[in-house]
Amino acid sequence: MELSKYIRSIHDYPKKGILFRDITTLIKNKDAFKNCVDQMSKILNKLNYDKIAGIESRGFIFASPLSYNLSKPHILMRKKNKLPAERHSVDFELEYGKATLEIHKDSIKTKIPSEDKVKKKIDEKNRNIYSCF
């Protein structure tokens, strides 16, 4: 299934010069969403890791079914001050500003799939899909 046709592109959102990839059109289509999760599951099944990390907020949508499919724990990477226990923070820059992600310190000593390893396993036609998450 060509998943890119289920993702809407919105120019100049949330500000001028940004091309926003709207995944709501993918997740509202049960067949496309299932196919997307199944494709990601196949890719992740080939990698060595301990947990699935869901990055707020789009990542939560995909990490939960992936965690279930692959029988792996799901850890949350959240915006600053959203996690209740002791946290580790990382600041980074986006196309339109700065942000901070946090993870519970007791989740740090785990192997999670890196973006580079996942991208190497994705076929060319769906590579842009992964970049939306």
In which residue ranges do the predicted regions lie?
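PRPP-associated nucleotide enzymes
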Residues: 1-133
